[in-house]
Amino acid sequence: TGLIASSFAGCAKVNYVTEGAIKAIHQIKDGSWKKQAEGEKAGSSEDTSVLEKSFEAGKYGGVEFKSLEDVANYYKEAYDYTKTLTAEYVNDKGQTETFYKLLGDEKINVGKVMIDGKENAVINKLVPGIVDGLFKPNIYGLVPCNNRNPKLDNYNCNEKDPGKKDFRKSYVKGEDVLDANITDNGDGTITMVIQPKAAEMSMRGEDSQGDFFEVLGDISATVAQIDVISFAQGTAEDNIKVTYKGGTVTCTINTKTKEITKAEYDMVAEVAVNHANVAVIKDKSASLLIKYKNTFPASDEVTMKARQFKRK
């Protein structure tokens, strides 16, 4: 389970799992690691479309889309415009705060835990409970996002020193998109479903997956600092691999204003750790599948429960 902990350690938004997964080592008897049922091997490395229908050039909602690059450009324009919009919210102390108009929540699902290429029923049952118990969902603007306050939505969360990335602007490019489809909703809006190309060890705003999703970032650097984990050979950087593949972005856009009114970001990542030593477990490999979802807009009920504020 420390292997599972290492899978999450680099992500600021899901690092609550690290502590819980390390604790779970003490809940599993050593023998349970040996009683491994046969499971399916890790998925194909091929990057193929998961969309129900592939891209078809044409006019949707009065907008011409000739290529996937047109889809990417339109999405970027809509994202950029939507992130210029703010709204006033009131917190549980009665104070007014200004955040993005479009805010969303987050959910995470962890499954398909495999040890040495085989699924382990004990761990597969244990992990979701740990995750659910520890998960403290936050509220964000359109992802990737570092803060719901637009002034702080940058690499450093600092208005005066934003650092290398400003997440009020999308970094999406035509070459990021593997496939997409568009539906004219007949009410002045279109719905785009976009599948970014697969990527490994993604960073926010720096590759096909990091341009669209709230990715995990540099896991290996953090794992290297976890005392209970060591490696039988090589370093954390050598032995940890995160592959993002098969995730989709679904967004509804008002074609008159280019405002995104509704969106769902479904990120899928496989985390693999090799040659790991955790307590009495020596030189093991482990992998797990993370499904991370951001849903927009978040209701007042959700924002109050998660972060004690609601729309004014």
Model-predicted segments: where are they?
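Sec-dependent N-terminal signal peptides of Gram-positive bacterial secreted proteins and lipoproteins
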Residues: 1-15
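Subset-of-secretome marker
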Residues: 13-312
